[in-house]
Curated annotation (Swiss-Prot):
Location in or out of the cell: Secreted, Cell wall
Name of the protein: Probable pectinesterase/pectinesterase inhibitor 19
Chain residue ranges for the region called Pectinesterase inhibitor 19: 23-172
Entry similarity comment: In the N-terminal section; belongs to the PMEI family. In the C-terminal section; belongs to the pectinesterase family.
Single GO BP term: cell wall modification
Binding locations of substrate: T290, R430, W432
Species the sequence originates in: Arabidopsis thaliana
Glycosylation sites: N265, N281, N412
Misc. remarks from the entry: The PMEI region may act as an autoinhibitory domain and prevent untimely PME activity during transport.
EC identifiers of the protein: 3.1.1.11
InterPro entries documented for this protein: Invertase/methylesterase_inhib (IPR035513), Pectin_lyas_fold (IPR012334), Pectin_lyase_fold/virulence (IPR011050), Pectinesterase_cat (IPR000070), Pectinesterase_inhib_dom (IPR006501), Pectinesterase_Tyr_AS (IPR018040)
Lineage: Eukaryota, Viridiplantae, Streptophyta, Embryophyta, Tracheophyta
Length: 524
């Protein structure tokens, strides 16, 4: 008994020392249980520095994921004959395995960054914060997407356990924030080692020159090396730190394109957003899982899309149907058209930048949990299914420590020619998760937007915890006198507040965007 009391005493001292118990860890019981588990394998836990403890937690979590994957696969084989929806289970299993591999990759990269000599400058800190946030996003995506049934009942408790562990890791990480370290002021952060090197292929402002030096060419008329986009992507090297450019000539490419996370630093460049078109019509009505409906899904870090169209033609009656899903860190979409209806653009996770794009849809047509900034984009609401309202954003930040949010800056928010603004209401956003974070700044807002501006997801959920902001917008829809009265919504007056949602602050863009050679505005 004395041994147990002493162990628990040491545990509580440890938690106080590392600043987790009171200030950083919301789930106290999970923190205690997990740290007890770690204590069993470490006789000197109370003496370990916070960063070292976090590394232990992450390594432990990677091992846990391996155990969970093996257990789920074995369990699924044993119960396969009991499943009523084998096709759905196969789809769920594929998604589960993809998400688990993604989380392992992010945790391993986080450990490497924590062990690196640059930590904790601002650049390396934001890298780890991004990746650990994305781990939680992947787990939550699994729970959201896996269909109801025996498979989900077996998997969900394991996912809940992984979520608790990921939240503990994130809480530990927050406790070693460098923001109070004055020594960091003079540090110039660097891009992570896997981000592409700057060479002659990175002169993106000269699109014609870039096409001429592309690694491969795709053409419907036979003038390129490949006739399909997928064939060209298959030819790209794996785990490359050098940029691989694919030029896709004018044409309509009817195919489902998936860029795996083993193919970083990939550029797709077309002849223009009205000339090079990748299209499909998958929707939740025939594919079941929104995550898998994307016409183009990019999971690779450092992805860049230029001068092309990503289209989903499923239509307003088919439910969620993604045109473009982006799940890779430090991704850029430049001068592209994203065209769909519900959930048209899915910035799923990690850091993303959209510049001079045309984005059109209906319900939640910019949705996800990425850290994403949209600059100089045309955001166009179109006619939805009868009885529906349009909602532009559905940002899904689930926990306060997660690093995510959307900024719409210097964009035009308007109606398509087919939208009946007299009968269809359009809103700037609604909270997919309770800490949903969106800022609309310095933009033109047309009269299509309802005077309330924002709409609830369900009842009062998240209205006091969300972070919805507006700043210096103009146009008939920008009048804020009749906006919602939620405590989580604010009209910003102070430019210092608005600065927190800029490329430099929200996206940490100065550490990586300049390497892409895509134009951007760092501040207001």
């Amino acid at each position: 008994m004395l041994v147990k009391v002493f162990s628990f005493f040491i545990l509580m001292i440890t938690m106080v020392v590392i600043g987790v118990s009171k200030e950083y860890c919301d789930d106290k019981q999970s923190c205690q249980n997990f740290l007890l588990e770690l204590k069993a394998g470490s006789s000197s836990l109370s003496e370990i520095r916070r960063r070292d403890l976090l590394i232990i937690v992450l390594k432990n979590s990677v091992r846990r994921i391996d155990m969970v994957m093996i257990g789920v696969m074995d369990d699924t084989k044993q119960h396969e004959e009991m499943e009523n929806d084998l096709l759905g289970v196969k789809e769920d299993t594929k998604l589960f395995e993809e998400m688990m591999e993604s989380t392992k990759d992010r945790m391993i990269r986080s450990v490497e960054e924590l062990l690196g000599g640059e930590f904790p400058n601002r650049g390396s800190y934001e890298n780890v914060h991004t990746w650990l946030s994305s781990v939680l996003t992947s787990y939550i995506t699994c729970i959201d997407e896996i269909g109801e049934g025996a498979y989900k009942r077996r998997v969900e408790p394991k996912l809940e356990d992984l979520i608790s562990r990921a939240r503990i890791a994130l809480a530990l990480f927050i406790s070693i924030s460098p923001r109070d370290n004055t020594e960091l002021i003079s540090v110039i952060p660097n891009s992570p080692s896997w981000l592409f090197h700057v060479d002659k292929k990175d002169l993106y402002l000269n699109a014609e020159a870039l096409k001429k030096i592309a690694d491969v060419v795709v053409a419907k008329d036979g003038t390129g090396k490949y006739s399909t986009v997928n064939a060209a992507i298959a030819a790209a090297p794996q785990h490359s730190q050098k940029r691989f450019v694919i030029y896709i000539k004018t044409g309509i490419y009817d195919e489902i394109v998936v860029i795996e996370n083993t193919k970083p630093n990939l550029t797709l460049i077309g002849d223009g957003q009205d000339l090079t078109i990748i299209t499909s019509n998958l929707s939740a009505s025939n594919v079941r899982r929104t995550f898998n409906t994307a016409t183009v899904a990019s999971n690779g870090n450092g992805f860049i899309g230029v001068d092309m169209c990503f289209r989903n033609t499923a239509g307003p009656a088919k439910g969620p149907a993604v045109a473009l899903r982006v799940s890779g860190d430090m991704s850029v979409i430049y001068r592209c058209r994203v065209e769909g209806y519900q959930d048209a653009l899915y910035p799923h996770s990690d850091r993303q930048f959209y510049r001079e794009c045309f984005i059109t849809g209906t319900v939640d047509f910019i949705c996800g949990n990425a850290v994403a900034v949209f600059q100089f984009c045309q955001i166009v609401a179109r006619q939805p299914k009868m009885g529906q309202s349009n909602v532009i954003t559905a940002q899904s930040r689930a926990f306060k420590d997660i690093y995510s949010g959307f900024t719409i800056q210097k964009c035009n928010i308007t109606a398509s020619s087919d939208l009946d603004t007299t009968t269809v209401k359009t809103y700037l956003g609604r909270p997919w998760r309770i800490f949903s974070t969106v800022a609309v700044m310095q933009s033109f807002i047309g009269d299509l937007v309802d005077p309330a501006g924002w709409t609830p997801w369900e009842g009062e959920t998240g209205l006091s915890t969300l972070h919805y902001r507006e700043y210096q917008n103009r146009g008939p829809g920008a009048v804020t006198s009749r906006r919602v009265k939620w405590s989580g919504f604010k009209v910003m007056k102070d430019p210092k507040q608005a600065t927190e949602f800029t490329v430099a602050k929200l996206l940490d863009g100065e550490t990586w965007l300049k390497e892409t050679r895509i134009p951007y505005e760092s501040g207001l």
